[in-house]
Amino acid sequence: EEALMLRMDVDANTSKLELPIEIPAYIKNVYVKYGNGSEIQTVPVESNGTISIVVPANATALSRVTTRANKEVETNNIFNYPGYGNGTIMFEDMYPALGDYDFNDFVAWYNFQIDGFYWSHNQCYAEYLMIGFQIRAIGGIYDYNPYIRLAEVQYNELDLEETQMYLERNNPEEAENIKILKGPKGELIISLKKPAIPNGYKYYNTEVNEKTKPKKMMAIYLVFNSPVNVKSLQDSKMDFYIAKTNKGQEIHLKGYSPVYYNSNESYVNEDNFIWGLKVPASLHHAREEVNFLEAYPDFEQW
């Protein structure tokens, strides 16, 4: 139960179901429990990262409820990513130079949850998305702040008033540091503010004797004013990046493009070294001035 990635009700008339969700790359099999929990299927993850579930013959019809968009939906549907614990993002902030390559210039844990999604015309839709985000460390010297771009979700698809209400309710101490922005292509961008460096220290939670404990995980609850396809809310569609203020220098993960300026930057050099790293697990960062390859020796080969 601790590693629950997906829970959903299935139409009793459905014999096979292909789910529009992404599975972390390291997972080879998922386990499907149904009925009273006494029957379990082992389902291999396909090469494209999807799974197909064969619905058992003894499926039971369940009652339905009505959504904000007056759609009938299954009552128990929930999708958690990464399923167990949190994912990790890490950045080096000296792009395009490699710097000390300790990958602790900016470190955060994240997760997300799609609650109450439903099927309509063979597509899967959601009206809510919860993103958990916790800044774990800041070992960089440059003034970067974190952002999350949902490239396939439009700013005008968000119910701003209700979203703001949830931000203030769930994050009373951090709400003013969470801003919802409209990107240059109309896309939805979440702007976050890094925490202050503790008195007497140069960095945040990276020095050997520092006693800083990260603040609790923020709960960013997005409410959509119209249904959004679940395919647009998957991990690969979330562009985590850091950027300087006033639309300055951006640093993205490999394969993602800059938001506010046109370029061919790929954020990877000719030796395949990167400036941003995302892992679907709770990864601990290296302390200051410890090379990442020393902390994680297998990283270079990978």
Regions found by a protein language model. Give the residues of each.
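Extracellular distal adhesion/interaction modules in secreted or cell-surface proteins
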Residues: E1-W302
